[in-house]
């Protein structure tokens, strides 16, 4: 079973990219579980056809310790298994702590057991890993491969670099490695070349360039992944290609984070600062 965490700047399209990629893997016959690690609890919506799922923390709050696995895991597109850790009430408690509670709960209830025949577990993780709780999949060896969703925008690249610092910090203890950057295009000038160069300097690869297409939004409005909504569309093939590249990937590295000056030089070299 491969354990993968998807990180990236808030709003970059992690949940969308994760769910569309999972749909691609499911179509290939892979058995996948998705663990949403975001208080917004939107990491599985498209796989479940828009069904709002009761989160692990909500279930715990309402039912106490008496929780069954089927209370917190729902079956989604292509027999994917979907669960959301959820978060504390706004303004109370720590969302990162909630993720730790949820993942421990899933382990205790046997969500990762061999009987499910899982090929993949995906953790879709909030934001920029500035807080220890959100770093938990990296820190405690829950995830072994990290993919960072990035674009050619300054803050997305800055966040990706920060995440690499987190991976570097825990690489020895948790055995976690960076599998590559996924460029979720924002149609920035020279975007593909810039992210390829960023990947090179970090010592990794740009595993796939996902072009910007309104079909993604159209599918989302219909509460589906692109592969589910319009399987013949070119954008569906992009996600299939990404799924295949992740399935075939053998490049796992400890990244070499850039200094802020190097990052700014990269932006200037590719003309974004002009």
Swiss-Prot record:
Binding site for [4Fe-4S] cluster: 94, 131
TM regions (residue ranges): none
EC number: 1.18.6.1
Pfam annotation, one family: Fer4_NifH
UniProt keyword terms in alphabetical order: 4Fe-4S, ADP-ribosylation, ATP-binding, Iron, Iron-sulfur, Metal-binding, Nitrogen fixation, Nucleotide-binding, Oxidoreductase
UniProt cofactor note: Binds 1 [4Fe-4S] cluster per dimer.
Role this protein plays: The key enzymatic reactions in nitrogen fixation are catalyzed by the nitrogenase complex, which has 2 components: the iron protein and the molybdenum-iron protein.
Membership in a protein family: Belongs to the NifH/BchL/ChlL family.
Protein's recorded name: Nitrogenase iron protein
Organism, scientific name: Chlorobium phaeobacteroides (strain BS1)
């Amino acid at each position: 079973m491969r354990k993968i965490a998807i990180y990236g700047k808030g709003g970059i399209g992690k949940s969308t990219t994760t769910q569309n990629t999972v749909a691609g893997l499911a179509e290939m016959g892979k058995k996948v579980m998705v663990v949403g690690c975001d208080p917004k609890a939107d990491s599985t919506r498209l796989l479940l056809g828009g069904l709002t799922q009761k989160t692990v923390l909500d279930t715990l709050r309402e039912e106490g310790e008496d929780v069954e696995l089927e209370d917190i895991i729902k079956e989604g597109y292509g027999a994917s298994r979907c669960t959301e850790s959820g978060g504390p009430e706004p303004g109370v408690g720590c969302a990162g702590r909630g993720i730790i509670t949820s993942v421990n709960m899933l382990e205790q209830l046997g969500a990762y057991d061999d009987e499910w025949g899982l090929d993949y577990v995906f953790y879709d993780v909030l934001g920029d890993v500035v807080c220890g709780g959100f770093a938990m999949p990296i820190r405690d060896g829950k995830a072994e491969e990290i993919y960072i969703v990035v674009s050619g925008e300054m803050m997305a690249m800055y966040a990706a670099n920060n995440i690499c610092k987190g991976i570097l910090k825990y690489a020895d203890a948790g055995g976690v490695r960076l599998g590559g950057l996924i460029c979720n295009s924002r149609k920035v000038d020279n975007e593909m070349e810039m992210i390829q160069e960023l990947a090179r300097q970090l010592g990794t690869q740009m595993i796939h360039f996902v072009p910007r297409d309104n079909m993604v939004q159209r599918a989302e409005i219909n509460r589906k992944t692109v592969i589910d909504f319009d399987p013949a569309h070119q954008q569906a093939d992009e996600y299939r290609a990404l799924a295949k590249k992740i399935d075939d990937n053998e490049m796992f590295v400890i990244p070499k984070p850039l200094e802020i000056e190097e990052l700014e030089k990269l932006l200037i070299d590719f003309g974004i600062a002009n």
